[in-house]
Amino acid sequence: MTMTSNDYRPIGLQAIDREMARQNTDAIASFDGNGERAKVIATSLRETGGLLLLGMGGSHAVNRAVEPLYRALGIEAIAVTLSEQLGMPLAIEGRTVLITSQSGESAEVLRWFSETGGSEDTFGLTLEGTSFLARTAPCLVGAGGTELAFAATRSLTVSFALHLAVLAALGEDPALGLAVLAAPATNDIGAALSAFENVATVVTSGRRLQGLAEALALGLTELSRTPCFSLEGGQLRHGPMEMLGPKVGVVLFRGNDATADLVTAMAVSAVETGAPVVVFDASGHQPVEGTTTLSFVRATGLAAIFSMLPVAQRFMIAFAEARVENAGTPVRSTKITRSE
């Protein structure tokens, strides 16, 4: 494992530090500043009863994370990558469509509008108020402008806050989520990093928090250039358990919801394989023996996500910094993907 010098922090990580330093403040401002547009989207959702969430990269992970939250309110929500929607489209008629793109300029966003023209129930979610997406569709616009650093950090937190505004307009109580944003968790990640010191691959997994697991896997692989991927808890159980062992790190997300016991069972099984297991835990349950557990305030939904996310971000950054000298500076990708 490559360790970077203590007196030098890669430029790319310095850029991420700047984004993260203001992400919670920007998230609260985003919630406060988008109430009226959120009400318009909520009205559309009540009328259609369906929600098609479209995005790419970290935006798709956000969509996957909020998908169950809308379903819990009786809205038939489905998150699909824009690339899949372009090639094998679901009907947009009779559905509210919400397209998420932090830059508002990705290639798939431009092509989707060029080919479909959108609909009267098509909305956007972006960090850039002058972007193509913001000019083309009514948008929720996050505070703070475009995220400049590679790997999504602030853009995730702000996007979740914009969804909190929509969920609040649908009748959900945002108080706990906002309270967590105002006082972010500061868990020590040292034990988790030590547990993963010798892993060659990481798999992240959750049940209701699967979208958060997918966001972490993406960030881990972008920054560390180590193979990191995500499997929903049931999918991990059905066959891929065969890959687990001392060289495969497992990260699980457990919230205070009806799926918590299933995540617990997976933690027990993963420990039995000899794999190092880190659990981000907002369930209020006892830690599973043999795991490295980071405990958070008992919560579910966006409150759980807001609790865990900044700590998970610090974990992925430190994991990457220990492995590559220029973590945070992409060598094969760009911040805004303008090609398909």
Tell where the protein language model's regions lie, with residue ranges.
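Phosphate-moiety recognition in structured ligand-binding domains
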Residues: T2-I16, A137, S269-E340
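Active-site phosphate/pyrophosphate-binding segments
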Residues: G12-G49, C139-G249, T259-A260, R323-E340
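A broad, structural surface signal
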Residues: R18, R22-T25, D32, R64, ...
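Glycine-rich phosphate-binding loops that contact phosphosugars or nucleotide phosphates
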Residues: R46-D188, M241, P246-R298, F306
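Short, residue-level hotspots on alpha-helical faces of the histone-fold
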Residues: P68, L218, Q313-I317
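Hydrophobic side chains within alpha-helical segments
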Residues: R111, E222, Q235, F315-I317
